[in-house]
Amino acid sequence: MAQYNHAAIEKKWRENWEKNPINVNDGKKEKYYCLDMFPYPSGSGLHVGHWRGYVISDVWSRYQLLKGKYVIHPMGWDAFGLPAENYAIKMGVHPAKSTAANVANIKRQIGEIAAIYDWDMEVNTTDPDFYKWTQWIFVQMFKKGLAYEKEFPINWCPSCKTGLANEEVVNGCCERCGTPVTKKNLRQWMLKITAYADRLLNDLDKLDWPEKVKKMQTEWIGKSYGAEVEFPVEGRDEKITVYTTRPDTLHGATFMVLAPEHKLAKGLATDETREAVEKYIFDASMKSNVDRLQDKEKTGVFTGTYAINPLNGAKVPIWLSDYVLADYGTGAIMCVPAHDDRDFEFAKKFNIPIIQVIAKDGKEIENMTEAYTEASGTMINSGDWNGMESSVLKKEAPVMIEKMGIGRKTVNYKLRDWVFSRQRYWGEPIPIIHCPKCGNVPVPEDQLPLTLPEVDSYQPTGTGESPLAAIDWWVNTTCPCCGGPAKRETNTMPQWAGSSWYFLRYVDSKNDKELVSREKADKYLPVDMYIGGVEHAVLHLLYSRFYTKFLYDIGVVDFDEPFKKLFNQGMITGKNGIKMSKSKGNVVSPDDLVRDYGCDALRMYELFVGPPELDAEWDDRGIEGVSKFLKRFYNLVLDNKDKDVKETKEMLKLRHKLVYDIETRFNQFSLNTVISGFMEYNNKLSELAKKEGGIDKETLRTFVILLAPFAPHLGEELWRELGGTDSVFHATWPECDEEAMKDDEIEIAVQINGKTRGVIMVPAEISKEEAIAAGKEAVKDKLTGTIVKEIYVPRKIVNIVQK
């Protein structure tokens, strides 16, 4: 008998698939779109952690293929943006060259996975034929008022020398390079994602996504209900508007805090406080929002000016503190220290009065040592509101405040508009022309794409200007409206621009007339299953939903959610759970493992290593067990393929149990237990073969079909050995007959007074009377008393109660 030679078998079937593709659209099958989050082509290539997501998506795609679907399973490259440019700078090569080399390397590595990617659909975000449509979307957003320019302090990475969106700042540091983030005043292009806040929030309910991701997006959007209240500034003709979710506590507002960037902040300083106020404003400008919100000791400065509480006329000192952000609410808050931990801490530190306005059972706390933050209680020290329940007043106060003319009921969001420009070279040029007469004018659609000019010096300037600003011949142009001299926008788009819509382009990637034809969009979109890491929960996944809703609104597609189902795979880590990285020296390359054990063994171990949604620690020794299983199954099939064994009832039962167990685990995405299930049933079949003298061909064929999505090369090889003339992937996924799974005989326990005294085998459909009689017969020598009760729990126990 031939030995299992993984190298020869895998080479043979790779070549066969090249000549005879297995996933062909005949126009009759139902489509199934399974998508990976496309990679950005880093210089380090793929390690075994990257393989995991690609293997999961390929196994799922092949399963859909066997279910009779036409599977859309494309791949492409997220190649613009900071990661690619930073790598190019580090290596001292132009990003266009380094990106092309990295794409070629990773494409070779992806080929080793043996995934059924349709490379005819391939896209690359740096291809002008692709980013023509990235720019086209921006132009449409500009025309609809969703893209606008604004100068304001943004997150600034001193190392990457570019602005960052809030989502790109992690623990006060740049997500990409880890440098502490500061603030810089810059002219920026913004996308008005806030216009879609309610739809982005409400439509989460219709998505089959992990609850964790939906919760993260819900919290990021951060919708809250409350009131805006106007506090007059004492001695001035000015008012400060605050946003509060607790207008019921207005009588307890003993001070007010403004963000250091608030437009009135500097002007509120008195002669005595001006120096301290200006220093505080400057110091705050050097901190990132994340730093400012961290749970550490609060800082602040008194402006020397007071506001008037509009409800009771009390003087309220106005402070500045960096824990208030200019871009949340109104950039000013009223502070009720008796009922907010942060305000309480601030008031204690700066000796500000604390007035309790909510009390349990209406009883005031003497000498408060902490804030009373219970959600409900009775109002005290609140004038006409005394005696009301705070939970009721919280809902009624916004309307009451509105009627008094001191504020209005309002809704607020934590979600901010998206900072969409980057001061870098390697990105899509923003298709806007600045004309002194006409203002901002979009590049005419028939002139798209506006291509990125080739330059010698692409390094970031650090001045707040993109390297494109230094290219006079490119910057200087004519206005498409008036024909006068004008200048091009020199900032580029962020790396998220292309990835926010790329999944739409795959199905019509060669179309030079439309982003995607409506015919193909209706036929092949949206995505049925999206697979990738949870780290994209509030970046890419939120942006993609925003883009899709916009494209739905302008009639490009007829759906407003891009991804029906989402699966987030866990990370593969090195020893002790440490993330794999070149710098840590713990990267495991798949190349050697493929050589030594084969692609099929590595694919299966990637899934066997642990539940796919959880992080798992890599251990090379584990692949040996999977490799042994493949050899044993190969030998089992070859040992039995030529035997003329008739199907027995036991074989039939085992076959249908195999189908049931594998499919149930598969559909639960419990892929690690699918692999262990294969191993269990291989052992059962081996034992049955010894007992029966062999295994029937239908059972062997069934096992091969079930295994094929996981070990496609071996699946094809054994399918041919069993007489298959076409690809195993043109077979049909087996169906399970639950009747055939049923046992003829079952084991039940026989108890006396609730204690097990024996076990008997009885027919599965035995009657109560027969079961009790059989049970009594089995323990008759132990029945010494008077029987007072006989109990039969079907298929489980017989219990004889005696005195």
Residue ranges and their predicted role:
Residues 305-311, 315-328, 357, 477-612:
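Alpha-helical recognition segments enriched in aromatics with Gly/Pro capping
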Residues 1-20, 24-31, 259-262, 271-274, ...:
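Basic, alpha-helical terminal appendages of large translation-related enzymes
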Residues 1-35, 65-74, 98-105, 280-319, ...:
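Conserved oxyanion/phosphate-binding beta-strand-loop segments in alpha/beta enzyme cores
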Residues 193-194, 199-223, 259-301, 446-478, ...:
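Amphipathic alpha-helical
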Residues 3, 11-12, 16-20, 90-240, ...:
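Residue patterns forming the tRNA-binding/recognition surfaces of aminoacyl-tRNA synthetases
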Residues 57, 70, 262-361, 366, ...:
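Catalytic alpha/beta core of large soluble enzyme barrels
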Residues 26-93, 99, 122-137, 160, ...:
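N-terminal catalytic cores of NTP/NDP-binding nucleotidyl/phosphoryl-transfer enzymes
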Residues 78, 143-157, 409-438, 495, ...:
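Helix-rich, typically C-terminal accessory recognition domains appended to large enzymatic cores
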